[in-house]
Amino acid sequence: MKTLLILTILAMAITIGTANIQVDPSGQVQWLQQQLVPQLQQPLSQQPQQTFPQPQQTFPHQPQQQVPQPQQPQQPFLQPQQPFPQQPQQPFPQTQQPQQPFPQQPQQPFPQTQQPQQPFPQQPQQPFPQTQQPQQPFPQLQQPQQPFPQPQQQLPQPQQPQQSFPQQQRPFIQPSLQQQLNPCKNILLQQSKPASLVSSLWSIIWPQSDCQVMRQQCCQQLAQIPQQLQCAAIHSVVHSIIMQQQQQQQQQQGIDIFLPLSQHEQVGQGSLVQGQGIIQPQQPAQLEAIRSLVLQTLPSMCNVYVPPECSIMRAPFASIVAGIGGQ
């Protein structure tokens, strides 16, 4: 009801003010403001409550006294401010109520979770002594340590196949290197100058033009071989030449094939002399001389660097070498 009265008073004041402004728009507006402003301030400080019991009497008689009444709604504006702090203050303590169940609920399950802690120590404690039982087979595993000295007895047995190493090296050397270095083998055999009846056969089989072709092929194949395998390649040429001469020697059976040497080399107490015949080394020194002949021929003919490791002839060739000659 108070708000309705205030609104009606405001409406009347606005209509009266607009009527006064329309009557004298030039000078009455300032005059009304000067008179109404102190009048509006006085009832606020002196008697703001006296106007509440007599709002109806002021409508027809005193329109000027009704003008200060529009400022009365300032008091009700302050009144709604009171419920704002009062209303939210009540729910704030209400929100504190749900805080009680939060500590109450988790406190109960925490002691409940402590119950499964009991089976954890009980269960693993029993299997731990059970796992100690497989420690008994460990000494059983120590029993096979006895056959370890037995294979030591077999260790000298693999030393026996070392004698057959040339047989194992043959399939490795022959398909890979000897096939590539067949021209080198042929040129070394051709450079040896046979005598008597065989000389005519060599001249027919290996003409001089083919000799140059084989020399070029030999140098090309030897240059394509990596430096790490050049030593093995030269040894393979030695091996292939020796095997071929052995086969020829078995086939001819009595035909003397003279393989003269271009140089007179002193090897220990013995010597290799031109026209002496097939070289059949029976000492490591003679075998070393044959190897040196091949090492001097191939690198000088093809201008290929030979590593110093090739100066050592391996033992497996000693049982195979029958003889070799060349320039």
From Swiss-Prot:
The keyword Signal applies. Residues 1-19 form the signal peptide. InterPro entries: Bifun_inhib/LTP/seed_sf, Bifunc_inhib/LTP/seed_store, Glia_glutenin. Residues 42-81, 128-169 have a biased composition (Low complexity). Residues 82-91, 100-109, 118-127 have a biased composition (Pro residues). It comes from the Eukaryota. Keywords: Repeat, Seed storage protein, Signal, Storage protein. GO terms for molecular function: molecular condensate scaffold activity; nutrient reservoir activity. Residues 42-169 are annotated as: Disordered. SUPFAM superfamilies: Bifunctional inhibitor/lipid-transfer protein/seed storage 2S albumin. The gamma-gliadins can be divided into 3 homology classes. Sequence divergence between the classes is due to single-base substitutions and to duplications or deletions within or near direct repeats. Belongs to the gliadin/glutenin family. This is Gamma-gliadin.
